[in-house]
Structure formats: structure tokens, C-alpha cells
Amino acid sequence: MGVLLYERDTNLTIQGINSIENFGLIGIFILEPAEPVPPLSKEDLQFEQFQTIYMFKIKENLDRLQANQPPASLLELVKDIQSHYGVLDHKLNFAQNLRSSADFVYKHSISVAILSALIANQMRIPDQEKAALITASLLYDFGYLYVPQSVLDKGDDLTDSDRDFIQMNLERGYETLRPQYETFQLPKPSLEIIQQAVFRNSKTLKIKEPVENIKLLADILIAADKFDHLTAMNINKAPISEVAAMAEMKKQRGAYNPLVLAALAPVSYT
């Protein structure tokens, strides 16, 4: 799932070793005293810690949903992300962890949820709608869990049939969530946002235009999704800079809401 990075001269403890198993990590890195490292602020360190904890929590919740069980701590995770990143009034140093095909769904979902919270705060979205957006951001890629590893391992080298297959499974993920949404006491607007995000590329179903506030929330999710795909570190694909990502998205006229891109800019780069 990734690595756990400790500061210089950290003593390795039994608890640290157990973290490898508990969090599904590849390993633990401890920097040597002479190892050059850029200064990390308290916020940077906190962000790294939160990413690891959040990833563990979203994996647990998505695994439960896949087994048709109610999520254990999803709403708690939403509240935590909202309390930390839905109120942030400055740029976040968005340090990315390396992703593989085995863990990208979890890491991508967490990054998109945080980005969505940052954008929503810039746009002064009400708290209730912000929570619905964060929930949708954590769940909209649920269908990727049905995609075989052999397809995910291709990265961007997908055939048209691969893309159609992935789209089919994203729609399957939505249809799996839909009948149990109220039972699981998840925000109803979240399901509408997920529907807009999932079915916008569907060849089988044309969805109706949503009400204005749902459309805006879906636009935020779609922009955050693309921005993270472009800037994330993947084993199969090198990332591009945040500035280059913004430039590429602005060039695709009509694909992304200009108001959303204007709100993304101050929280994504200086």
C-alpha cells in the first residue's frame, strides 16, 4: 500500500514494525542523520500521517461495502476530512505517495476527497453540501474494485474494450451502492453526485440534468478527479506538475467548470 516515513534518528519499535502489517505497507523508511531532506512543517507531517490513516479507513469501508456490509466508519472519515481540509484557507503542500495498481483506488479516493474539500471551501459551499461532496468523492470509484488486477496493471495503456469494461464496472459499483444507500444512512445528495460522475461517460444510460447545486458539486468532483490523475505518482506513469495540470485542464474547453478551476488554482499551487 505504500511506505511509512519517519524523521531522522527515529528509534524503530515493535509498534513501528507492526504498522507494516496493520496498514498493509511495503515497508518503513527512517532517514539517516546525513540524509538530505527538505524541511517539513507540522502541517506537512500531519498531512502524511492523515493520508496513511485515511487510506486504511477507506479500504476498510470499501471492503465492507463490497461484501454488502454497512460501512463501519465512513461518516467519521468524512467529518475528519471536512474538519481538517474543508476549512483550510491556504495552499496545502499536497505531498503524494507512490501508487500501484493494487492501492490506487484507495489513495486516489482520499486525494480527491481532500481536493474536493479544499475547492468547496474556496467556493464557500455550505457545510452540509460539503459533507455530501466528500462522501461522494470517497465512493464514486467503488466500481474499480471489480476490475481485475490484470487490467489495472496496464495503467494508461488501455484498449477501447478495456475502457468500456472499466466503465461497466464503475456503473456496477453505483448500482451496488444505490439500493442500500438509505439503509447505510449515507447522504442522499452524495448518490446523485456519484451518478453524475460515473455516468457522464456512459454509453448505455443518458442521465438527466441535475439540479444546480448537485451539478456544481459534481463539477468539483470531476475536476478534482482529473487533477489528481494528472499529478499523482504512479508506478506506470510519471506525474506532471500542478501548473501543467491546470494548463491542460483549462485547454479542454467545456470539460471543466471554469469557476471550479478558479477555485482549484489557489489551493493547488502558488
Feature names for model-found ranges:
Residues 1-81, 88, 237-270:
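Terminal helices and disordered tails flanking the catalytic cores of nucleotide-processing hydrolases
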Residues 6, 99-109, 132, 210-213, ...:
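Conserved phosphate/pyrophosphate-binding and hydrolysis machinery centered on Walker-type P-loop NTPases
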Residues 10, 137, 178-222, 236-240, ...:
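Histidine/acidic-rich helix-loop-helix segments that form or flank divalent-metal centers
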Residues 33-167, 178-179, 184, 189:
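Acidic/His-rich, divalent-metal-binding segments that scaffold phosphate/diphosphate chemistry
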Residues 113, 167, 171-174, 191, ...:
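An amphipathic alpha-helix signature
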Residues 140, 225-226:
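DG-centered beta-turn motif at the end of beta-strands
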Residues 161-162, 172-176, 232, 245:
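Phosphate/pyrophosphate-binding active-site loops
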